[in-house]
Amino acid sequence: MKINYLGTGAAERIPGIFCNCKLCKYAREKKGREIRTQTQLIIDDVLLIDFPGDSYLHLLQYDLCFADFNSLLISHWHSDHFYGEDLAYRMSGYALDIPNRLTVYGNEAVKTFYQRAFDLEGRQDDTRLHYQVIQPYKCFTIANYTIYPLPAQHGNFSEDCFIFVIDDGKDAFLS
């Protein structure tokens, strides 16, 4: 499996948008590898995991085309992992020449934030985007990957988050 980390930081990023600590000052000065954007990764150039507010930056930084992806796994509803408002720009009227539909996989909590993004737009585009609710411990298949969603506690909530075991038959990856 080829794993490409686009971002490995937390919600506040490094340097933090309002922070003046020693670490953030150092990151601002050195740039490059010292900068940490919000978490997002790609497996084998096929499977996209998480869609944070920094997705647009990742698109520019790594010369990506998110229109090429068919599948998106969302670990949880926090905006540093799922920023649905940007995902809505995949709809017709915003994006042209998209031949495929993106299926977004996540739990019920993520679905609420997904739906909110389209409620703000006043419409949905099911030809471009589809939401698939996934359940803890119930594996499913995307392309040649078997995905095992495992519940995790994150923040003050229980089971609002998934970690994923992703198995391609040769290798397994815990995300």
Model-derived regions, located:
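Core dinuclear metal-dependent hydrolase active-site scaffold
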Residues: 1-64, 132-175
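N-terminal short leaders/motifs
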Residues: 1-4, 86-91, 117-121
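Phosphate-binding glycine-rich loops and adjacent basic patches that engage nucleotide phosphates
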Residues: 18-23, 69-80, 124-129, 151
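Solvent-exposed, non-transmembrane amphipathic alpha-helical segments
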Residues: 23-26, 79, 89-94, 124, ...
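Active-site metal-binding motif and surrounding structural segment of the metallo-beta-lactamase
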Residues: 46, 51-105
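Active-site environment of divalent metal-dependent phosphoester hydrolases
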Residues: 79-82, 113, 155-156
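Active-site neighborhood of divalent metal-dependent phosphoester bond hydrolases
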Residues: 98-102, 108-133
